[in-house]
Amino acid sequence: MGRKWANIVAKKTAKDGANSKVYAKFGVEIYVAAKKGDPDPESNSALKFVIDRAKQAQVPKHIIDKAIDKAKGNTDETFTEGRYEGFGPNGSMLIVDTLTSNVNRTAANVRAAFGKNGGNMGASGSVSYLFDNKGVIVFGGEDADAVFEQLLEADVDVDDVEAQEGTITVYTAPTDLHKAIVALRESGIEEFQVTELEMIPQSEVELSGEDLETFEKLYSVLEDDEDVQKIYTNVDGF
């Protein structure tokens, strides 16, 4: 699993580096986090968490600063979080998290993306019960046992720690992700490849041929929607 995360991060970072839509999505997320609390990330842990993720995706500093400055202003623009669940070809499943200023527009767009690209929308809970909500942290290292002990000493609810090919992957209870990050930073870890709340599939499916092509198109259309923040799937490699 550790190598999987590293591979996904490498692929995502390469794509994000040239993708202005990703920058815009992080801009919205940073704005919302700053608007809900203090616009200073040192006193707003939710904002700091989003900024750290943005930096991992190589979002330029001026995009981050612009979103924070917007939150400091008098704008009354509001955004609503949403979650949609659905099915793709041959046992594939997707969970789509959105952040939008127009819920009706977003719902229609997500439904159309599924319907026009070989998928179909499901009811709330039709997919998510087959996924586990976890905090995921990935960083360079070798000694998984030492990291596990360190997190236990910091009273972190840690599910598992894996080491593979120089990369350590930590899985925590979602409520303890921030605590785990703080504990690891205090131990001297300065750079993280991943710090995310994830919906992890309990089992994965492998697609090939036309099924894979159909799924890739569906995933791409959803990913390109400006209101879609994250997509979780049970398809291997995504």
Curated annotation (Swiss-Prot):
NCBIfam families for the chain: PRK00110.1, PRK12378.1, YebC/PmpR family DNA-binding transcriptional regulator
InterPro entries referenced in this protein's UniProt entry, alphabetically: Integrase-like_N (IPR017856), TACO1_YebC-like_2nd/3rd_dom (IPR048300), TACO1_YebC_N (IPR049083), Transcrip_reg_TACO1-like (IPR002876), Transcrip_reg_TACO1-like_dom3 (IPR026564), Transcrip_reg_TACO1_YeeN (IPR026562), YebC-like (IPR029072)
Gene3D superfamilies tied to this protein: 1.10.10.200, 3.30.70.980
Keyword Transcription regulation listed: yes
Pfam families in UniProt: TACO1_YebC_N, Transcrip_reg
Gene Ontology, cellular component aspect: cytosol
GO biological process, one term: regulation of DNA-templated transcription
GO molecular function per UniProt: DNA binding
Protein name: Probable transcriptional regulatory protein SP_1922
Keywords: Cytoplasm, DNA-binding, Transcription, Transcription regulation
Family: Belongs to the TACO1 family. YeeN subfamily.
UniProt subcellular location: Cytoplasm
